[in-house]
């Protein structure tokens, strides 16, 4: 299933994976929140949910992979180094579930232009 992240005039199209995290987040959509930044990462709160760490949860993500950070109940999108990174990796503060991939990973680098408090919306892309 395709989803879209909208922040200001930037639209990022993604493909949800076939896992429990994606399934639960899709049921909550549309999700509207205000972003926070942490190095080259944005994250934002999601509504109450019961999402748990999946067996393949990880700390290091590739450009284009979308995470759900369980400890913060937040969607996290890394696009470069964070304060936890070693060298040039995209490292979250703790393990997170990989639940979606962007179609154009390089588009995530445009997130650098956004600041704390800016609104974001995540929704299912119309078929």
Give the ranges of each region predicted by the language model:
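A short beta-strand micro-motif
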Residues: 2-7
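Short beta-strand segments
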Residues: 10-14
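Glycine-rich active-site loops that engage anionic ligands at enzyme catalytic sites
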Residues: 17-24, 28-127
């Amino acid at each position: 299933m395709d989803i879209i992240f909208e922040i200001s005039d930037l639209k990022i199209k993604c493909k949800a994976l076939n896992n429990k995290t994606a399934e639960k987040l899709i049921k909550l959509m549309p999700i509207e929140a205000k972003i926070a930044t942490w190095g080259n990462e944005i994250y934002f709160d999601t509504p109450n949910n019961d999402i748990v760490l999946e067996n393949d949860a990880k700390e290091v993500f590739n450009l284009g992979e979308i995470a759900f950070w369980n400890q913060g109940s937040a969607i996290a999108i890394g696009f470069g180094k964070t304060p936890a990174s070693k060298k040039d990796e995209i490292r979250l503060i703790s393990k997170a579930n990989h639940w979606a991939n962007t179609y154009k990973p390089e588009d995530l680098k445009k997130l650098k232009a956004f600041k704390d408090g800016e609104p974001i919306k995540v929704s299912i892309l119309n078929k």
